[in-house]
Amino acid sequence: MLQGISNIFIMRLKFAFLLLTFCVLMLSCTDKKPVSQAQGISIGQKESTPVKRVNSVEVAKQKPLTYKILVPTAYRYCNPDTLINKNWVELYKDGKDYYVGKARYSIKIISDECGDGSAPKLLGKRNTILFVNQLPIRLGKVQAANIEISDTSYLVPGTTYSFTFLGKRYKLEAKAQGEDVFINYALLLNGERFFREVEAGDACFNFLFAGDLDGDSKLDLVLSAPTDYENLRIFMFLSSCAPPGLQIGKAAEIVDDFSC
């Protein structure tokens, strides 16, 4: 029995180490050249290899914009205090409108009974959706798509949004196989797959924002896609980071875990 407990403890330590490394890599992997899997693709990028899918992209970068993101929540493996600073901006909602402004935040230490006893919690001073280290857009009101976004509007398979944004028609679809556990879960934009999860559990995924974040009058997305209810995983997709032949590409990702 003691041997079994010891093995479980060792496995949890290994998981914690891997998650910590993953968190850091997701925030810094855009520094690598060339970029694979569309992470941190730059504006003004040069095409190196024609592709059709996001998960097979290789792009040579020229003066890249490296994106890092955080959301207002408690963290166990990521330390927001070493990442965010006064130069960051935030996407926030005021009434029905969305704005980008200078980041206004605070960090406090809270108790964490399942972790090391304490954890940093990043707090926004407004109705903050996302903190970003930089965005190629002027501060102020941003254009948002007219689709329903809420904490309970989950992207279950079969969900479809059809809308017009800044003169262009878009169709967002969620597809998957299976019922209790979704297999090959995918999100498509105008028929092009930009997100895929081999096994998505009950797929409690939802959009946090849909609109223009990079100033090119094209659709950008912020997606919450946790692997389970005790997991944090947020993606930022930008049209300016789209691989050749696609309309949107992953610009940044943040992952953390608060399971016991």
Residue ranges of predicted features:
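Beta-propeller-forming repeat regions
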Residues: 33-211, 224-260
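C-terminal motif of bacterial Sec signal peptides marking the signal peptidase cleavage site
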Residues: 27-28
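Acidic/hydrophobic-patterned starts of short beta strands in beta-sheet-rich repeat architectures
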Residues: 215-225
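Positively charged n-region of N-terminal signal peptides that target proteins for export
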Residues: 2-3, 8-15
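Sec-dependent N-terminal signal peptides
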Residues: 15-24
